[in-house]
Every structure is written in C-alpha cells, then in structure tokens.
Amino acid sequence: MMGGRGTGGKWPSAFGLLLLWGVAASALPLESGPTGQDSVQEATEGRSGLLTFLAWWHEWASQASSSTPVGGGTPGLSKSQERPPPQQPPHLDKKPCKNFFWKTFSSCK
C-alpha cells in the first residue's frame, strides 16, 4: 500500500510545525509607533484568527485520521487483501527472435 504507515506520522508532525510557527509568530515583539495600540489590536485579532484556524485544522485532521485507520486500532483486511494474488502461469524461456525489428511490432514465430 502506498500511503501505509509513513503517512500516519506526517499529519501530526505537520500540525506540530504549524503550531510552533504560530507560537513563534505570536511571540515576536510588536512594532511600536504612533499607532501602537492599533497594532496590538491587530495582532490580537490575528492570533485569534490563527488559533481558530489551528483548532479547525486539528479537528479536521483528527476526523480524517479517525475515519481511516492508518496503523492503529483493530487490524482489518480489505477485500483486496483477503483474497490470494492471482496465479500466473510459469514463465517459459523463449529464445529471442533473430530478425525482430521493433518498428514493425511483428511477433516472432
């Protein structure tokens, strides 16, 4: 399976990085100037917007991970994993064609 166990660790680590980025961005000193109070208010609104987004994203990621178990929970097999792989006929060793020309797509006899 292509998206097996490797994908399970990607979302929590991405969430952690995004959360760290948000904390680091909110800890930066604010520019103080003639509109220092306005910049504090804008920063507060930005932080609340960021926290709202992070809460929504965490909820979305947890719902996605709970609906499709990646490696935890009860191990269940899908229908494609329950049946055995199709039996292939044994490979017959054939001698290569001496006069095979690839542009004609002719088969050798």
Swiss-Prot record:
Where is the signal peptide, in residue numbers?
1-25
Q: Where in the cell is it found?
A: Secreted
> Which Pfam families does this one have?
Somatostatin
Q: Does the keyword Secreted apply?
A: yes
Chain positions listed as propeptide in the UniProt record: 26-93
Q: List the disulfide bonds.
A: C97-C108
- GO MF terms held by the record: G protein-coupled receptor binding; neuropeptide hormone activity
Q: Which InterPro entries match?
A: Somatostatin, Somatostatin/Cortistatin_C
Q: What is its main location?
A: secreted
What conditions trigger expression of this protein?
Not induced by kainate.
Q: Any idea which UniProt keywords this protein has?
A: Cleavage on pair of basic residues, Disulfide bond, Hormone, Secreted, Signal
Q: Residues annotated as region Disordered? A: 64-97
**What GO cellular component term, any one, is given?**
extracellular region
Tissue spec. comment: Expressed in a subset of GABAergic cells in the cortex and hippocampus.
What's any GO biological process attached to this entry?
A: adenylate cyclase-inhibiting G protein-coupled receptor signaling pathway
Record family assignment: Belongs to the somatostatin family.
What's the protein called, per UniProt?
Answer: Cortistatin
Question: Organism source for this protein?
Answer: Mus musculus
